[in-house]
């Protein structure tokens, strides 16, 4: 868990087909495997940066 104990839930809502390679790699780095895939991640600056990079492809809760 994160030091502050907070988590964030991310869900992929759009495909990475036709996107820049860096965006596809970021989605994979978040642990998402396809549309509808959901992961609960630690709320860290690194994760927040990845979320910002692909915000148009995911839905964030928490």
Curated annotation (Swiss-Prot):
InterPro entries: Ribo_uL30_ferredoxin-like_sf (IPR036919), Ribosomal_uL30_bac-type (IPR005996), Ribosomal_uL30_CS (IPR018038), Ribosomal_uL30_ferredoxin-like (IPR016082). GO terms for molecular function: structural constituent of ribosome. It holds the Pfam family Ribosomal_L30. The keyword Transit peptide does not apply. The keyword Ribosomal protein applies. One of its GO terms (biological process) is translation. Transmembrane segments: none annotated. Keywords: Ribonucleoprotein, Ribosomal protein. GO terms for cellular component: cytosolic large ribosomal subunit. Belongs to the universal ribosomal protein uL30 family. Part of the 50S ribosomal subunit. NCBIfam families: rpmD_bact. This is Large ribosomal subunit protein uL30.
């Amino acid at each position: 868990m994160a030091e502050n104990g907070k988590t964030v839930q991310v869900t992929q809502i759009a495909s990475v087909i036709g996107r820049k390679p860096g965006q596809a790699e970021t989605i994979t780095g978040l642990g998402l495997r396809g549309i509808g895939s959901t992961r609960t991640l630690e709320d860290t600056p690194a994760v927040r940066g990845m979320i910002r990079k692909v915000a148009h492809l995911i839905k964030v809760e928490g």
